[in-house]
Regions:
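Anionic-ligand anchoring segments at beta-strand to alpha-helix junctions in alpha/beta enzyme folds, i.e.
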Residues: 1, 150-222
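Glycine-rich, anion-gripping cofactor-binding loops and their flanking helix/strand elements
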Residues: 1-32, 36-37, 197-238
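Glycine-rich phosphate/diphosphate-binding loops that line cofactor/substrate pockets in enzymes
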Residues: 6-13, 144-152
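Structured core elements
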Residues: 15-16, 71-72, 154-159, 222-224, ...
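Peripheral docking tails and interdomain loops at the edges
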Residues: 17-136, 141, 161
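Flexible loop/turn segments at secondary-structure boundaries
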Residues: 22-24, 78-80, 163-165, 192-195, ...
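ADP-ribose/adenylate-binding Rossmann-like module
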Residues: 236-246
């Protein structure tokens, strides 16, 4: 906490993103500790000179403007994916003209702009009636950029658990690495171990390290041996101009 106080001194704003939620707590765990550290630094400033600091291992905030405005964000609930656009939204929230929400959620839609079915519309109306401001708690960025390296190849597979899609993806990753020397990042979407259930597999290969770790919204090729894929997914989502669907 002594290092945190020194790092945050004089900052205009600080956003803390945590992959947890504690609805009955005053704050989430990390932001709670950071807020306590800032409070101790302010107490040091109120005490005056260095010799009279109440917390000698903490920084001294001599004026109120030394303390940053703190924002708290919650992400990844229910294993939901965090996109680069979500991080952009967290930063835009702090900027002048932004929403300035002190607590918010990323990567989750409490209510959607358009319901998929009439029953879902009824359900969302019930949520809006019970929680009128629930939509204000979700934040999205103004854009979701493609941060994959230049020359990257991105593939998404839609299949059914037990059909061997995961093994196919693993073999493809090993082949690209051994023959081309590409850096590989690949992962099955959660739930792929359930036989008979729809599953998704993501793979990207690039001549340099791949720094992002999320589902790919920009893909060069989509492979699907599942004839019913359009009934439970949108396999064309994120397919680039000139991309391939097999």
């Amino acid at each position: 906490s002594d290092l945190v106080g020194e790092i945050l001194k004089g900052r205009k704003g600080v956003v803390v993103l945590e992959r947890t939620d504690q609805p009955l707590a005053e704050d989430l765990p990390l932001i709670r500790e950071i807020r306590a550290t800032v409070s101790k630094c302010l107490e040091n400033g109120m005490a005056g000179g260095t010799g009279s600091q109440r917390y000698p291992h903490h920084a001294m905030y001599a004026k109120l403007s030394d303390a940053p405005v703190l924002y708290s964000g919650c992400f990844g609930m229910g294993s939901r994916d965090l996109q680069p656009g979500d991080v952009i939204g967290a930063v835009e929230n702090m900027l002048p003209g932004g929403a300035q929400r002190k607590f918010f959620y990323l990567s989750i839609d409490f209510v959607r702009d358009q319901a998929a079915t009439p029953k879902q519309e009824i359900f969302m109306n019930q949520i809006r009636e019970g929680y009128p401001k629930i939509k204000e708690m979700q934040i999205k960025g103004s854009e979701n950029p493609n941060l994959l390296p230049k020359g990257a190849i991105t593939v998404r597979m839609h299949s059914v658990g037990g059909w061997g899609a995961i093994t196919t993806g693993k073999n493809l990753a090993v082949t690209l690495n051994e023959l081309l020397g590409y850096d590989i990042k690949a992962n099955p979407k959660y739930g792929s171990e359930k036989k008979g259930q729809p599953t998704t597999y993501y793979l990207s290969a690039a001549p340099e390290p791949i720094k992002i770790n999320c589902e790919y919204h920009f893909v060069d090729a989509v492979l699907s041996p599942d004839p019913n894929v359009f009934g439970h997914s949108n396999p064309l989502f994120g397919l680039k101009e000139g991309g391939v669907f097999i």
